[in-house]
Amino acid sequence: MGEDRVSFEVMRSNQLPFVEWGNYRYSLKRNGGRNVTFVAWGYLRVPLAGNVPNALFCLSKVKQMRRLTRIDLPRSPASVSPYDLYCEPRDEKVVMSVLDSDMVALLRNNKFSFEFAEGYFYVHFAGLFRFWKPETVTLLAEIVSRVEAIRLSES
């Protein structure tokens, strides 16, 4: 989906946990390439300890978040306000138990969508991360610390 895919302003840790954050962009061309729309977002990737089922918590009111990926997972009828939850029905209980209410509130207050995929916790922001702002880096570091605390408590 899309063309001209590029990650930029990517930062990766060189020690455990192997965390990555950055910005991602691609373009959608319509009408034979005359109309180009750029879709961009910030992301954070943190490894998880256990085998957590794949799930996507997508902010209901942020249109750009719905375009991030083609959602192959079924939508859960019991969404977590203000998130639409996409996961297999049998996995909903496990997925919900991974995050505490403080973490969900932190993500909601900062308008992040998030997902569990292939052993990683991903956070998506509908827009670009502004890494030159100390509060952006502090916020991402807080999320990493919380996920790492959950990971360590499970192992």
Region roles according to the model:
Residues 1-155:
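Charged, low-complexity intrinsically disordered regions
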